[in-house]
Structure formats: C-alpha cells, structure tokens
Amino acid sequence: MGFRGAWNKRNRLIEDLDTFLKLYKKAQKAYKKVRKVEFSNNDELIENAKKRYQEIWDEFRAFVNKKAWVDPKLWATIRKMNQTGDRKVVKTYSRDSQVISDFVNHTIAVHNGKTFVPIYITPEMVGHKLGEFAPTRTFRSHPEKSAKVVKKK
C-alpha cells in the first residue's frame, strides 16, 4: 500500500470517536477473556469466547476499515485538551497514528525506542504518521580516512 495509500486515507476519518472507543475497549475485553478461558479445559467455553471475540472484532474492523488510524486514547486526550484549551505535552508510543486536523498546534512526544521526542504539530503534517517525525536511529558521521590506509593493487 505504501505512502500513497496512507495519504489517500487522510480525509477519511472515523466520524464518531465515542463509538470507536467503545468498540476498541469491547474488543480488548473480549480478547482478554479468550486468553483467560484458554487455560481452562472446557472446549465449549473456549469456542464460545473465541466466537464472541471474532464477532466483536469483525464489527470493529468494519467500523475502522479504509479509514485513517488514530490511537483512540491519544485522540480522546487531544479532544479533551481542545475543549478545555490546555496545551500540555502528550506522550504516546503510537508511532503508527496518523496526524489529523485536531492535533494541529499541540505538542506530542512520540517514543523513538529510547526517549520521547517532542513534536509540535503544524498544518503541513496532517496526513503523515507520527513516527515519521521521531527518528529511531542516530546518524554518526562516516569515519575519516586515516593516513594508515594503503592502496591495494
């Protein structure tokens, strides 16, 4: 799919954040229940839990499919800050979340594997992923050639 596909999704956002959060939490609960039930020896319980989880997951995927992904907790936090007018730094591990118009003029600290890199969101960043602005590797310059290097013949 690559970058072009992700760029095409930038205008297709999830309309209802509350429903999105509800389905997300419901799917997480169902998954935890499946993991918990797997330790029991009752095959019927395991099958019912897996079936229930699959139904919830299918509903969640249908709701989210072909839309820009934004971490629901991050989005809810930013939405609260927009309503109250706060401008605190928000820490997130979600590098795969797409920058949406609600994030503009906020500072989001994205984890690069070692530290949180603060990123001030501008309108030009909308449509890109948060991870693009927090590099995970540090570039150390190429080694200088020393006088000891001998040419091979």
UniProtKB/Swiss-Prot annotation:
Disulfide bonds: none annotated. InterPro entries: Ribosomal_uS19, Ribosomal_uS19_bac-type, Ribosomal_uS19_CS, Ribosomal_uS19_SF. GO terms for molecular function: rRNA binding; structural constituent of ribosome. Keywords: Ribonucleoprotein, Ribosomal protein, RNA-binding, rRNA-binding. Signal peptide: none annotated. The keyword Translocase does not apply. Residues 64-153 are annotated as: Small ribosomal subunit protein uS19. Residues 1-63 are annotated as: Unknown. GO terms for biological process: ribosomal small subunit assembly; translation. One of its GO terms (cellular component) is cytoplasm. PANTHER family: RIBOSOMAL PROTEIN S19P FAMILY MEMBER, SMALL RIBOSOMAL SUBUNIT PROTEIN US19M. HAMAP family: Ribosomal_uS19. Protein S19 forms a complex with S13 that binds strongly to the 16S ribosomal RNA. Belongs to the universal ribosomal protein uS19 family. This is Small ribosomal subunit protein uS19. The lineage of its organism: Bacteria, Pseudomonadati, Aquificota, Aquificia, Aquificales.
